[in-house]
Amino acid sequence: MAVAPPSYCFVAFPPRAKDGLVVFGKNSARPRDEVQEVVYFSAADHEPESKVECTYISINQVPRTHAIVISRPAWLWGAEMGANEHGVCIANEAINAREPAAETEALLGMDLVRLGLERGATAKEALDVIVALLEEHGQGGNYYEDANSCHSFQSAFLIVDREEAWVLETVGKYWAAEKITEGVKCICNQLSLTTKIDAEHPELRSYAQSQGWWMGEDEFNFSEVFSPADDHLTCCSGRDTLEKQEESITVQTMIDVLRDKASGVCVDSESFLTTASVVSVLPQNGSSPCIHYFTGTPDPSRSIFKPFIFVDDVKLVPKAQSPCFGDDDPAKKEPRFQEKPDRRHELYKAHEWARAVLESDEEQGQKLRKTMLELEKQGLEAMEEILTSSDPLDPTEVGDLFYDCVDTEIKFFK
């Protein structure tokens, strides 16, 4: 498999973001044929001493988990990106570091995204959850559904809530984190933290010294110390994409950035593709709801961003969920990945038809794209009304919001 291109996570805080909103966005660059699903899990209570089965290992469950909505490769337990009922959003980046990632099966970075969302009611709580689990269980295992080779990586995370964000970068069990409360931040598939470190593993610096990577004389620069060769000197091409925006950053701005192929933010190569995208808007005014827009389909430039709002009675969306193969899933059997089952869900299949039209028939494709963007615009305008309204949100009106959007999209493609 070719070397994976970068995927990007962004966050913008006021005053760069509009109207007291925190805006979060993520593109997931993964193997072209991999299917992502969008799944909602309600809050739940769990029996004492119960276990939770993650992608490769089981760990102790906590007494209560928060409601979450996630976008994930359909073969694994965790998530590439997602949000919880408390307005916490997390996205994961696969990182190469000076210390090779373990191939031994442990927690994946994607597992840690989901665990952070399920167990953290703030961005800082989610960070604390992730680093505690790293210390206890470590990270490792194949990031791809590939029987021929193990693709293992270290992990970086962008963890965001209504008030602050944390960039968390990890190498094995060691980690450093930076707190963000203003401006624009982007992370991709490189270590990015330098000398501004607001929290760290207690043995981070002594470990670097023991490996001969830092002598203790110069100022400690995390990415210089832990990056392979001169990797830390190169700059992600998408890093300036948001910063150069002259207008206040909105949901539409973030969507446009995620659709930008010229900058490399939207990946479309022979082996890799942006297989799913998300944009979240988190009002700093706690009385307004957080809104999360998922594609559930590949290539955001040819997808519709569909809104989701947490309420007590969220209607499940099986049409955006992949088939379940249970214990017969080749991802759960050892040796793993001996077969590749058809994981396409109904929305994905409908979108395949749309992609074929967009690629093969210029006139029909232009009409189709125009209609897709009009559907998306209607959703964005309806959500803008919710955010600017002084009336309290009626949960009965939005419990089936994402369901209706997916259903409308599928019917339109048919």
UniProtKB/Swiss-Prot annotation:
Q: Does the keyword Glycoprotein apply?
A: no
Q: Which organism is it from?
A: Bos taurus
User: Which gene specifies this protein's sequence?
Assistant: SCRN1
Q: Where in the sequence is N-acetylalanine found?
A: A2
Q: Which Pfam families match?
A: Peptidase_C69
Where is the catalytic site? C9
Q: Keyword Cytoplasm, does the record have it? A: yes
Q: What else does the entry mention about this protein?
A: 'Secern' is an archaic English term meaning 'secrete'.
- Taxonomically, which superkingdom? Eukaryota
**UniProt name for this protein:** Secernin-1
Q: Where, by residue number, does the polypeptide cross the bilayer? A: none
GO molecular function terms listed in the Swiss-Prot or TrEMBL record:
cysteine-type exopeptidase activity; dipeptidase activity
| Chief localisation class | cytoplasm
State the similarity comment: Belongs to the peptidase C69 family. Secernin subfamily.
- InterPro entries per the record? Peptidase_C69
Q: Among the entry's GO cellular component annotations, what is one?
A: cytoplasm
Q: What are the record keywords, sorted?
A: Acetylation, Cytoplasm, Exocytosis
Its biological purpose: Regulates exocytosis in mast cells. Increases both the extent of secretion and the sensitivity of mast cells to stimulation with calcium.
As for subcellular location, the record says: Cytoplasm
A single BP term in Gene Ontology = proteolysis
